[in-house]
């Protein structure tokens, strides 16, 4: 059974510096070690987002491209919500190409959009 308190304390320290690299590391780790149902997955999402939305928010530009495709832990509406990611303005939406999500935004550079497309193909 998923122990919320235990999970919270185990990732609180790694998340304390509130950096994109810590977020990436934690998500990569969780993708390797956690197999759970959708309800538990949702709880994990909320806990991670809560920890990383404290103090200084994560800059979207610092997230690794591959982290955008770890949708088993993060859902796009949560990750892209301006409440949690404040580096870019609202108006982001997402589409699908080759069964993988791609983020589109008028606020992202053309180069970054190209990288996302390239990763998808």
Swiss-Prot record:
This is Chronic lymphocytic leukemia up-regulated protein 1. Specifically expressed in chronic lymphocytic leukemia (CLL) cells from patients without immunoglobulin heavy-chain hypermutations. Expression is detected in all CLL cells and levels are similar in patients before and after treatment. Keywords: Cytoplasm. The keyword Electron transport does not apply. Tridimensional modeling predicts that it may interact with the IL-4 receptor. This protein has no orthologs in other species and appears to be the product of a protein-coding gene which has arisen since divergence from chimp. GO terms for cellular component: cytoplasm. The gene is CLLU1. It is found in: Cytoplasm.
């Amino acid at each position: 059974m998923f122990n919320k308190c235990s999970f919270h304390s185990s990732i609180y320290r790694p998340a304390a510096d509130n950096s994109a690299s810590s977020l990436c590391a934690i998500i990569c780790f969780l993708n390797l070690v956690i197999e759970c149902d959708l309800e538990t997955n949702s709880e994990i999402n909320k806990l991670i987002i809560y920890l990383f939305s404290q103090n200084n928010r994560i800059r979207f530009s610092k997230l690794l491209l591959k982290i955008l495709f770890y949708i088993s832990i993060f859902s796009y509406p949560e990750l892209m919500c301006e409440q949690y990611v404040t580096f870019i303005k609202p108006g982001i939406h997402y589409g699908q190409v080759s069964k993988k999500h791609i983020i589109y935004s008028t606020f992202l550079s053309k180069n970054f959009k190209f990288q996302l497309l390239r990763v998808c193909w």
